[in-house]
Each structure stands twice: as structure tokens, then as C-alpha cells.
Curated annotation (Swiss-Prot):
A GO BP annotation: 'de novo' AMP biosynthetic process
Protein known as: Adenylosuccinate synthetase
Active-site residues from the entry: 13 (proton acceptor), 41 (proton donor)
Protein encoded by which gene: purA
Entry keywords, A to Z: Cytoplasm, GTP-binding, Ligase, Magnesium, Metal-binding, Nucleotide-binding, Purine biosynthesis
Entry binding sites for GTP: 12-18, 40-42, 306, 332-334, 415-417
Major enzyme class: ligase
Reaction(s) catalysed (UniProt annotation): IMP + L-aspartate + GTP = N(6)-(1,2-dicarboxyethyl)-AMP + GDP + phosphate + 2 H(+)
GO molecular function: adenylosuccinate synthase activity; GTP binding; magnesium ion binding
Family annotation (InterPro entries): Adenylosuccin_syn_GTP-bd, Adenylosuccin_syn_Lys_AS, Adenylosuccinate_synth_dom1, Adenylosuccinate_synth_dom2, Adenylosuccinate_synth_dom3, Adenylosuccinate_synthetase, P-loop_NTPase
Metal-binding as UniProt keyword: yes
Broad class of the protein's primary localization: cytoplasm
Cofactor descriptive note: Binds 1 Mg(2+) ion per subunit.
Keyword GTP-binding: yes
Species this protein is from: Syntrophus aciditrophicus (strain SB)
Length: 432
């Protein structure tokens, strides 16, 4: 059985939660490897919706091991609330185990305060932060002053590291941003309470993963957000603070890259984006409004309206390259039903320069680009009942075939509705 990485090919919100939930049936271990509670994965099982921000989507299945890896930044209050909510609704199976890496960094109150203060102070275009403290937490990690789960669980060490951080952060908050200082003792007391509630979940998750692999148990690595929010490969500076590409599944969980066998790229049948940043195929018209309305395009974390547009294959081809994607899972194909004509962006044009496979990193050049479109005929048939490719209208099949030809990667799954069962499965990546 293979180990499989699932990543987004766009700007997040591609429907990874549903696909991970589906693949979790075949995996024995499901591991998150980056991001924090700035991303939300929406699952619909038997008509009931569940939104998870930190806990892996596989938590709804029996007999699983769910891991929050060292590459994730953890807000302990959010983690506790998710655990208690799932247990209260009877959705945390007693035979499924949850572990949090001792090396995962902790989001502190001053991270959230700094996040919001910086965004407020920015002149001109905002980054579009969720205000959850993700960026500042990763900054502390890189600056080697961050507080990890293992530090939080050691009362003496936590007090020492907290004192150093509060002194520095209060200087920045008060002197640079004119914000009120945070209170060290209040934070200490609050987080010591959290520590006791999460202590039983803390573990060396790298060792757990190694043991499970040696037993031949298939592992699913769950990415958050999407390739073009990646700190290295995204539309910088309108990106997140972590690496969202498949290669980080290794670093963010503590297993070797040779253990990763398949990479599944999740691609929405059109394109959406939350917050600021370039979006060449954005539709500020009736079609864009229709995609937003029919697709229910509101952020699972922020509730913000998602910007909508035609499918941008430049983004997808770029994602295929940087993540080494071996199979595509197409989501929300049903949202396109009823559109007479569909457009695919197959390149960017700037003067005499054509960019068919990668996004220009220079924001000035990107701003000057125009999308190059191909047109395809749409369909009117309701496809939500389709369970195999032959059930789809011919034009829907042609649309999927064109995505394959443009990327050189096979479509292995098609989602035709929000429910777990509203899916066409063409290949099981765990059988590779």
C-alpha cells in the first residue's frame, strides 16, 4: 500500500477536506504537516457538516491514527475546542487516536495581536491575513524564540521562554504599533490550563509515523491551503507563512521523502481566492456571482466571500510541477452545470511574452498580463447522481479530458456534490 500526499493546486478552498475524508477510508494514519487554524476543511457526512481547522479530516473514521505534525502551528484553545466539539457530537471515535507533535510551535496571544496590528498599519493593499497569529508564530519559529508544545508542558521552561517573549513583543506592540501590552501572568495561567488538557495528546509523532510505516500501514498526508499560497512558490507576498507543497509533507512530519509515493492535487473545476492578491481569471459579472452563489463560496475559517473566476490552468500546471503531482482530483464539477460556454485559461499574455506554465514572480509583470482563453461547450444535465465517467454528459467528459491533456496528469477522482458519496472514483492511489 502507498503513502499518499494530498495538496491544493490553487489558492486553497479546493475541497481537500472532502477528498481527504474519502481517502481516509483506505489510510490507517492521517497526518497534517503545515499551517494552522487559518485553514478550514469542510466535511459533509450523511448530510451533517463538520468544519475542522486543526485536527486531520480522518478523525471522523474508526480505527485511525490522526497526527498534527511538527510543521503545524497550534492554537491550543482551538485544538481543545475542536476535540470537545467532536466528542460532544459523538464524532470522535473511541478507537481513533489523536497525537500532536511535541515539536509543533504554539500560537500565543501576542501573535494574534501582532498579526492584526500589522495588517491595520499597512498602507495600500493589505495581505489579507486571517488574524489568527499564524505568520507571527512562524516568524518566532524561524527566529528561534518560539514556544513549542514540549516547552508548554514544562512549567519552568515555559515561564522562562514566555518572559523573554513578552518583554520583546510588548516593546513592539507599544512602541511601534501603539497597542496595549500583553500581561505575562495572565498568559501563563491561561496556557498552563491548556497544557493540562492537551498533555495526553503530545508525542514524538515522527517515531509514531515510522512505526506505522514499518508495520505496512498506509499513511495519508493532509495539506492545508494551496500551492499558490506557498511561501516559496506562491503569488508572493499574498501568501501564507508555511510551505504548502508536497515536499513539505516530509519536513513537516519528520519522515524521509522516499516514503512519499503518490501526490494527489486537488483542483476545483473553476478558480477561487479569498482575500487580496492577483487573480487574472476573476469574474466580476453575473457568471462570477453565479459561481459564488451555487458553489456556496464562503471561507470556512473567515466566512469571507470568495472571489470566483474561470479555471486557471497556468496555476494548475505550475502546481503539478512544484509538487510532483501524480493524479488530479477535480471538485465542484457540478457547479458548472447550466453554463452554456466554459472558458479555460491556458496562458498569460504580456506584450509578446506568453506564460503557459508558470506565474511570473515579478508582480509588476503579472499585473500587466492578460489571460489567454480556450472556450468549451458546457452542459445542462444534473450530474450529482453520476458515479462513473459514463454517467457524465459528453461535454463534461471533454472538459476533464482537456484538463488531463493540459497537465499531463490523469484525473483519478471527480466530485459532483458536497456529500461523501457524490464522487466518481477512477483510481485508488493507495493501490499504486
Amino acid at each position: 500500500m502507498a503513502n499518499v500526499v494530498v495538496v491544493g493546486t490553487q489558492w486553497g478552498d479546493e475541497g481537500k477536506g472532502k477528498i481527504v475524508d474519502r481517502y481516509a477510508e483506505d489510510a490507517k494514519v492521517i497526518a497534517r504537516f503545515q499551517g494552522g487554524n487559518n485553514a478550514g476543511h469542510t466535511l459533509v457526512v450523511k448530510g451533517e457538516q463538520t468544519i475542522l481547522h486543526l485536527i486531520p479530516s480522518g478523525i471522523l473514521h474508526n480505527h485511525k491514527v490522526c497526527i498534527i505534525g511538527n510543521g503545524v502551528v497550534v492554537d491550543p484553545l482551538v485544538l481543545i475546542q475542536e476535540i470537545e466539539s467532536l466528542k460532544g457530537r459523538g464524532l470522535f471515535p473511541p478507537d481513533t487516536r489523536l497525537f500532536v507533535s511535541e515539536k509543533a510551535h504554539v500560537i500565543m496571544p501576542y501573535h494574534r495581536q501582532l498579526d492584526l496590528a500589522r495588517e491595520t498599519r499597512r498602507s495600500g493593499v493589505k495581505i489579507g491575513t486571517t488574524g489568527r497569529g499564524i505568520g507571527p508564530a512562524y516568524e518566532d519559529k524561524i527566529s528561534r524564540v518560539g514556544i513549542r508544545i514540549c516547552d508548554l508542558l514544562d512549567e519552568t521552561l515555559f515561564r522562562e521562554k514566555l518572559a523573554l517573549n513578552v518583554e520583546e513583543k510588548n516593546f513592539t506592540l507599544t512602541s511601534l504599533f501603539g497597542e496595549p501590552p500583553v500581561q505575562e501572568q495572565e498568559i501563563f495561567d491561561e496556557y498552563q490550563n491548556y497544557a493540562e488538557k492537551i498533555r495526553s495528546y503530545a508525542a514524538d509523532t515522527s517515531l509514531i509515523l515510522e512505526r506505522e510505516m514499518k508495520l505496512g500501514k498506509p499513511i495519508l498526508f493532509e495539506g492545508a491551503q494551496g500551492c499558490h499560497l506557498d511561501i516559496e512558490h506562491g503569488t508572493y507576498p499574498f501568501v501564507t507563512s508555511s510551505s504548502t507543497v508536497a515536499g513539505n509533507a516530509s519536513c513537516g512530519t519528520g519522515i524521509g521523502p522516499s516514503s512519499l509515493n503518490e501526490v494527489i492535487g486537488i483542483c476545483k473545476a473553476y478558480t477561487t481566492r479569498v482575500g487580496e492578491g492577483p487573480f487574472l481569471t476573476e469574474l466580476n459579472d453575473e457568471i462570477g456571482d453565479r459561481l459564488q452563489r451555487v458553489g456556496q463560496e464562503f471561507g470556512a475559517t473567515t466566512g469571507r466571500r470568495r472571489r470566483c473566476g474561470w479555471l486557471d490552468m497556468v496555476l494548475v500546471r505550475h502546481a503539478v510541477r512544484v509538487s510532483g503531482i501524480t493524479g488530479l482530483a477535480i471538485t465542484k464539477l457540478d457547479v458548472l452545470t447550466g453554463l452554456k460556454t466554459l472558458k479555460l485559461c491556458v496562458g498569460y499574455q504580456s506584450g509578446n511574452d506568453l506564460y503557459p506554465e508558470s506565474v511570473p514572480p515579478n508582480p509588476r509583470i503579472l499585473q500587466q498580463c492578460q489571460p489567454v482563453y480556450e472556450e468549451m461547450a458546457g452542459w445542462t444535465e444534473d450530474i450529482r447522481g453520476a458515479r462513473q465517467m459514463d454517467d457524465l454528459p459528453s461535454n463534461a467528459r471533454r472538459y476533464l479530458e482537456r484538463l488531463e491533456s493540459l497537465t499531463g496528469v490523469p484525473v483519478i477522482l471527480v466530485s459532483v456534490g458536497a456529500g461523501r458519496e457524490e464522487t466518481i472514483v477512477l483510481k485508488n492511489p493507495f493501490s499504486s
